[in-house]
Amino acid sequence: MALYEHVFLARQDMSAQQVDALVEQYKGVIEANGGKVGRVENWGLKSLTYRINKNRKAHYALMDIDAPAAAVHEVERQMRINEDVLRYMTIAVEAHEEGPSAMMQKRDRDDRPRRDGDRPDRGDRGDRGDRGPREGGRESFGDRPRRPREDRA
């Protein structure tokens, strides 16, 4: 039997329980066709790069599959029919990765506390402190005088 990684996207208006039920449904299809499912990861609701069927977000799920090609074809056929599945992708792999996937590691990294203090959007200025106000106030354009506005009618 061949090894596969299978990722699918489910509609954004589904609940997490419905996505889990969808995973269990496809797990049953694989097992009924002589395969087995190893690791299953639910990556949660994430933003899409572009809209798919008027959806801006989707629930992502990953399954590690050890099954014959016929089982994978049957799962893909059922996913094409199901309107709750927006996209799917199956990739043949040499071996399944051990431990959490890169997406789950990224989620763990995002949960860690930040180290950059009270200004996370700017670089560290060291011991220099803030710059303070500019000379001349807001109206100043340096050594250049301000031109009068032309009325366009």
UniProtKB/Swiss-Prot annotation:
MF-aspect GO terms: small ribosomal subunit rRNA binding; structural constituent of ribosome
Example of a GO biological process term: translation
Residue segments, region Disordered: 94-153
GO cellular component terms given for this protein: cytosolic small ribosomal subunit
Role, per record: Binds together with bS18 to 16S ribosomal RNA.
Family label: Belongs to the bacterial ribosomal protein bS6 family.
Protein's UniProt name: Small ribosomal subunit protein bS6
Source organism per UniProt: Allorhizobium ampelinum (strain ATCC BAA-846 / DSM 112012 / S4)
